[in-house]
Amino acid sequence: MAESLMDIKRKIASTKKTGQITQAMQMVSGAKLSQIEKRAKKYQIYSDKVRQIVTHLAAGQLLELANAAESDTDSGDKSQVISVASLLQKRPVKKTGYLVITSDRGLVGSYNSTVLKAMMQMIKDDHESPDDYVMMAIGGVGADFFKARGLNLAYEYRGVSDIPTFNEVREIVKTAVTMFDNGVFDELYVCYNHHVNTLTSAFRAEKMLPISDLDVSEVADTNVEYLIEPDLDSVLESILPQYAESLIFGAIMDAKTAEHAASTTAMRSATDNANDLISHLSTQYNRARQAAITTEITEIVGGAAALE
């Protein structure tokens, strides 16, 4: 019985240490979540403004591309439009690229499994052959997952900061745009967990390349005229990659927010489970100790009675 009591006591001590660790991790994740939520809100204001400017500047290019798509003639103007604003040009889709965002480590609940399960279902539904798609992975969990299943992983990036910066994203965007221009894929979807609230996230797949979320009708009734130097083509060649960068950066910020929320929830759940286990073990320990004391008292009383 004494050995059993010691075993229970060791389990209680071990569980308390685990609970302290998970509680500390919960507090760290909560602090990161609060910080990135504030940055994400500020970034959304910037992103909306960039989108507005790009829509105004690219309105003429979008209209020319739309007219060119409806026409069967190959004019010099059409080739000029495509060369200046290639990121806006839609082309026949022979291969699709998927940029999948996961975490670099576990302890985030179902965060990674939700994304990867949805991705595999998406591939199964939309593609008949592995030659129809190519994978890009941000995060070690996703990269290892695709490698283990023999999928065509053309690019991987590990070690994104808990609070991402533009400098990190530039390398990713540059690679994605280069692969798009070189015909590695004809369209790119960014797939990640969208942050809804602390307890909820939802899988999202957004088309990033070619840029297709610019609506000319938004500027149709405005009379804004920009004075552009040196010329519109040069400005578009500079600002369109920056806009693509802002789109992907926004997706990474959103995914990281969902990751920290999932980590906070998972660690809170682990801490609660540890406390419940400690309570159960403490009750078990007290009962065992009470039984041991009762046995000792019974033995003493029995021995005393035998001496009479």
Swiss-Prot record:
InterPro entries associated with the record: ATP_synth_F1_ATPase_gsu, ATP_synth_F1_gsu, ATP_synth_F1_gsu_CS
Identification of the protein by name: ATP synthase gamma chain
Species per Swiss-Prot/TrEMBL record: Lacticaseibacillus paracasei (strain ATCC 334 / BCRC 17002 / CCUG 31169 / CIP 107868 / KCTC 3260 / NRRL B-441) (Lactobacillus paracasei)
A GO term, aspect molecular function: proton-transporting ATP synthase activity, rotational mechanism
Keywords assigned: ATP synthesis, Cell membrane, CF(1), Hydrogen ion transport, Ion transport, Membrane, Transport
GO biological process per UniProt: proton motive force-driven plasma membrane ATP synthesis
Similarity remark: Belongs to the ATPase gamma chain family.
Function per UniProt: Produces ATP from ADP in the presence of a proton gradient across the membrane. The gamma chain is believed to be important in regulating ATPase activity and the flow of protons through the CF(0) complex.
Gene: atpG
GO cellular component assignments: plasma membrane; proton-transporting ATP synthase complex
